């Protein structure tokens, strides 16, 4: 990679989806029931499978995974928790999906009520903090978030 390519910051991942569910339910499924829709293979637990994903419902709360063996694995922190409109999370997983309390990118999710449905505006930004490989990582993360948001949509529409 040349010097010019290294200076180009990767764009944020931005997604917008329409969910056929009221805003309160869409927010609740995203923030309180992440373990119901998060892909179980997208786990950082080693030696165990994923049982749940928890977002503590307050600014300053934890965002973490619970393994089937009861172990807890940090993913990040809750920066803003404003039901049913906005959720901001600090993603503290490095490009190797290792938790690092000194590392942070930002996941922001905004919920907009429109004609009895909910439009979800998703953004994962500050990806340049991933380092020299950030541009290459962006493609995989973009696809991963697209898949996860599809799973979220299906769960929210089921109720």
Predicted regions located by residue number:
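Short, conserved beta-turn/loop elements at beta-strand boundaries and strand-helix junctions
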Residues: 82-87
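A conserved amphipathic terminal alpha-helix motif
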Residues: 119, 126-159
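Hydrophobic/aromatic beta-strand elements that line small-molecule binding cavities or substrate pockets
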Residues: 15-17, 75-80, 104-112
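Hydrophobic pocket/interface hotspot
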Residues: 26-30, 63, 78, 89, ...
